[in-house]
Amino acid sequence: METKELLKKVRQLEIRTRGLVNQVFSGEYHSVFKGRGMSFSEVREYQIGDDVRTIDWNVTARFDHPFIKIFEEERELTVMLLVDVSGSQFFGSQGQMKRDIAVEISAILAFSAMKNNDKVGALLFSDQIEKFIPPRKGQSHALRIVRELISFEPKHSATSIKGALDYLNHVLKKRSIVFVISDFMDSAYETSLRIAGKRHDLIGIRLLDPRERELPRVGLVTFRDAETGAQRWVDTGDLKVAAAYLAYRRSVEEFRKATFIKAKLDSIDIRLDKPYMKPLVDFFRLRERRW
């Protein structure tokens, strides 16, 4: 992509997404995340009315009467965007590809973090770690992330959510807010997700094109796997073929849901045929009420 064209796209996306941040989203981000990080400060003697869950049992045993832990809010948070750039992200039947929506949502989250003076970083992944941008503050850094997301051309096309989470668990030591933006057309990442979810506040953002839910009955067509490049003829009118595809899609979706539920992690479903801001805002408002 030419530099002039790239800068134009970045500017257009910045105007659109920062408008959404200012008008709709930043309040939800601030309410849910700002000050949620807590760090240990000191201990003091237990007083009537204190939350018994904060009792420090080691100190209590040592002095033979109860002490509680005092925590302070961590005003500065770190937001990490794990963005799937594999081949399946270049699909879209609704005028925009999954990757386009992933870029816009990432921009909204990056600008929200910037507006709240938080650090933001990004990890772009396929079945390899394509690019890692360490978390930093500031407008220029948020714009750098947006530029990379718009212009980046991955070297690989397959998907490994496990690989991305393992890398995250290795490089990011401080507890962070982690968004995994993907269609989650993958498996065998449950252990890595559970570990990452214990270390970080992890939220999945699943992108779904409605055309992917079932095969359209259009007769004999050539299908190309966006991640492997393999091609084959498929009779979409064959009921057995349609049933097998539907069963596969259900198994992938059931695995994703069960994995997030078991790890006690939140996720958001974003359909490409509907505006993405409503499910995002609804989710954060629901989460704010839970706090």
Label every PLM stretch briefly.
Residues V103, S157-I161, R249:
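A conditional alpha-helix N-cap/helix-loop micro-motif detector
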Residues I105, G163-Y167, V252:
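Well-ordered alpha-helical segments embedded in enzymatic catalytic cores
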Residues F132-R147, A258:
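Short, electropositive alpha-helical surface patch
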Residues V83, S182, I205:
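Active-site flanking residues adjacent to catalytic metal/cofactor-binding acidic residues
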Residues N58, P154-A158, V180-S182:
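Short, flexible loop segments at the rims of nucleotide/cofactor-binding pockets, characterized by
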Residues H141-S176, A188, D209:
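Von Willebrand factor
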Residues M1-F33, E42, D51, H170-K174, ...:
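Von Willebrand factor type A / integrin I
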Residues M1-P135, I177-F179, S187, T259:
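An amphipathic, basic-hydrophobic helix/alpha-beta surface used to engage anionic
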